[in-house]
Regions:
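Conserved, mostly hydrophobic/aromatic
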Residues: 12, 40, 48, 80, ...
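Structural preference for beta-strand elements that scaffold enzyme active sites
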Residues: 6-10, 47, 75-79, 99-102, ...
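Catalytic cores of alpha/beta
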Residues: 74, 78-100, 189-225
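Glycine/small-residue-rich loop that forms an oxyanion/phosphate-binding "nest" at active or ligand-binding sites
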Residues: 54, 62-125, 247-248
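Conserved anion-binding
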Residues: 13-15, 19-20, 24, 98-174, ...
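Glycine-rich, proline-tolerant flexible connector loops at the mouths of alpha/beta enzymes
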Residues: 47-65, 105, 173-185
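Charged helix-capping and loop-helix junction motifs
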Residues: 61-68, 111, 154-158, 184-192
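C-terminal helical cap(s) of enzyme catalytic domains, especially alpha/beta-barrels
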Residues: 114-121, 215-255
Length: 255
């Protein structure tokens, strides 16, 4: 085994509820995000990713209390995104116990924020979140979206990823909106295009339905894979996913 992958549990939050949709739409309430975070941590997940999915629409982030409670119970990296619009917003969420900040909407609207966050807290803290959809006007390319996949940016995903890294992003969170929630496999062409274009770790999400999907993503270049529906709906456990990943010839942290 030579290729390694990190397994991340993605927890989308609306108000105080863990939610899940398909292609970022049709949200369904699933329960207490803190309880799920603790469950996945105890099962051996490598990292947690919290996203306040409506924060950018309402100019606020409601994750402070959730993050603060989570870090009392878990001892793995926690990344937080949604509604982070300034260095002060990032400072606050880090003070609650987060290790990294994922920024999408505010970075598209004001790209220099990427540099400001990287200079204030280190590039390892600045995660550029990219919501990618296959473009109808640019054959073979993807467009970056924001406001939870609702708004066009006009940015080519690969070029935006390269620009974000040049501005100081130390990691990319790449979500395929087209595949998100379907549990039918990931957009491997997208993963390969972005990972070949940048020299920082890329967390890939959207479409995981089994361990083989994660193996495919790793072989396409992903450094980490964010899982949601496959875990939330109990299709596979963290242990089962990791067993499948190892069986596919990819290294993952032992539980």
């Amino acid at each position: 085994m030579s290729k390694k992958i990190r397994l991340i549990a993605r927890l989308d939050v609306k108000d105080t509820n863990l939610v899940k949709g398909i292609q970022l739409e049709g949200l369904r309430k699933l329960g207490d995000p803190n309880a799920c975070a603790k469950e996945y941590y105890e099962a051996g997940i490598d990292e947690l990713l919290y996203i306040d999915i409506v924060a950018s629409l309402y100019n606020r982030n409601n994750l402070s209390d959730i993050v603060r409670k989570t870090v009392d119970d878990v001892y793995i990296p926690v990344c937080v995104g949604g509604g982070l619009r300034s260095v002060e917003d990032v400072r606050h969420i880090l003070s609650m116990g987060a290790d990294k900040a994922a920024i999408n909407t505010a970075a598209i609207k004001r790209p220099e924020l990427i540099t400001e966050v990287a200079e204030a807290f280190g590039s390892q803290c600045m995660v550029l979140s990219i919501q990618a959809k296959r473009s109808r006007t640019w054959p073979g390319k993807w467009e970056a979206y924001y406001d939870n996949g609702r708004a066009h940016s006009g940015y080519d995903v690969v070029e935006w990823a390269k620009r974000g890294v040049a501005l100081g992003a130390g990691e990319i969170l790449l979500t395929s909106v087209d595949n998100e929630g379907l549990q039918q496999g990931m957009d491997l062409e997208l993963i390969e295009a972005v990972t070949k274009a940048v020299n920082v770790p890329v967390i890939c999400g959207g479409g995981v339905g089994c361990g083989d999907d994660i193996v495919d993503a790793a072989n396409a270049g992903a450094d980490a894979v964010a899982c949601a529906a496959v875990l939330h709906y109990k299709k596979e456990t963290v242990t089962e996913l990791k067993e499948d990943i190892r069986a596919g010839g990819v290294e993952v942290r032992q539980v």
